Design a protein with these regions (language model features):
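Active-site beta-strand/loop architecture of penicillin-binding DD-peptidases
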Residues: 1-19, 36-124
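Short, highly charged C-terminal tails/helix-capping segments
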Residues: 126-138
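Serine endopeptidase catalytic core focused on the charge-relay Asp
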Residues: 32
Length: 138
């Protein structure tokens, strides 16, 4: 992405992002968020954060080398956001060549959970039940 241009006379022109449209509809975004959150809850994920409904996805990728993929090494990841009903953060955890396990679900997801447990305190995001009660006027 081009962010600036420097002309021969050293004058600089900066370019900001341009919104060209919506990638998916609001309804589709809500459906996808529900699917991601439900999948995490149903698999007793290490990414869960008590009191918060989180949406996210694990990833595990082989590492390419000159003669093919490296043996027994991966890039493990987890990307998640929340709270699902009013997202305030998105976090990506990426681990190159994790040693305890090659899987994102066993390495990056628990790291995400530990990070987000601290993040919700730092950002002063109340648990879902408290936020929803406040929104309902109670």
């Amino acid at each position: 992405m081009v962010t600036r241009r420097v002309d021969a006379d050293q004058s600089v022109t900066n370019f900001g992002p341009t919104v060209i449209g919506r990638a998916i509809s609001v309804d589709t975004a809500h459906t996808l968020s529900d699917m991601l959150a439900n999948a995490l809850q149903s698999e007793s994920s290490g990414a869960l954060v008590p009191g918060y409904r989180i949406a996210g996805k694990t990833g595990t990728a082989q590492i390419p080398g000159p003669g093919g993929y490296e043996e027994n090494t991966t890039i493990a990841s987890f990307i998640g956001y929340g709270p699902v009903d009013d997202p305030r953060f998105i976090v990506l955890i990426k681990l190159d060549r994790p040693t305890s396990s090659p899987w994102g679900s066993e390495t990056a997801a628990p790291a995400f959970s530990q990070f987000v447990k601290r993040l919700v305190v730092l950002l002063e995001i109340p648990p879902d039940t408290i936020r929803q009660a406040a929104q309902a006027g109670g």
